[in-house]
Amino acid sequence: MNMDFVFDEERFRITDSIDQTYNYKKIGDFQTEVLIPRNSPIRLQKNIIAAIKAYYLGYKSIDSVYKKYSDYWFIDSDSLEEININTYMNVLDYVKNNVNTFLDLLQNLDCNEKLGLIVSRAALYRLQSTFKSILLLMSRNQYLESMNLCRVILEQCSWAFCVYAKEHEEDIFSINPLNCLKDFKTFYTPAGRLYGFLSNRVHISPELTPEYLQIINNEIIVTFNPISYRYDCYYSILSVTDMYCSTIEYIFRDFINKFDFVNKYEKEFVLFKEREFVTQANIFLDDIRNSINNEIHR
């Protein structure tokens, strides 16, 4: 079988616009939103919200609105410390650089003679839109939603791994991505632990209740994205980026010459223990630990 592979590159390519959007944040309500610098003081942000509310309520002053409701606002606010923005930007650059490098690799491969390779290539290539969605969600502090999509990437990589060597349509499309993890772990050994981590975070379990439930002025407040999830999200996106690149190198090992994520050990290709992710992730995680300490002592 020989088939031309066409890529709709411009529609999904990750761009620098994500860098720009992270320098700003939207605040407001269901009627009005405004865009402000991300490092704006909390008091200023609350004053803007109070002004919006007062306007629609017909009040001449924001004072009564601020006094009555401001305790409810930004209870789950993202930290405005510079280290958090820098950490995010470092994670963003790492993900973008690696994902775009491997998108180029997929686009230029010449391996269209086996059906399994064709569908694996397509499945992995289309994940670029999933990566972009994750980064955009992270820029809006939607950490749980970001980790949900990280799990989608894990499942899709697992499926691509299980079908790339297949030659017949019925063998490929009868495989459920949810049933591929066991085989995938034979290559990407951290997959099981990562899947468990993501599942525990994205499902609201009873033991997690204190993380998203707060009581203020004797009223119960639900927070949708506790700030602690940010660090879990960084870990998740770094991990699935490593998984994505490693999976591509392994599946298409017969068609590429340079390897950064896998290496040949005896007669088999295995994860390269000294790959960039291992060292870079430790650097990012150190930054994250510093951020956590700053949060605790703020």
Feature map (PLM): residue ranges:
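Short, glycine/acidic-rich hinge or "gate" loops at secondary-structure transitions
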Residues: 146, 166-175
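Short, flexible/disordered secondary-structure transition segments
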Residues: 164, 168, 209-212
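A cross-kingdom marker of C-terminal helix-rich interaction/assembly modules
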Residues: 1-119, 123, 130, 137, ...
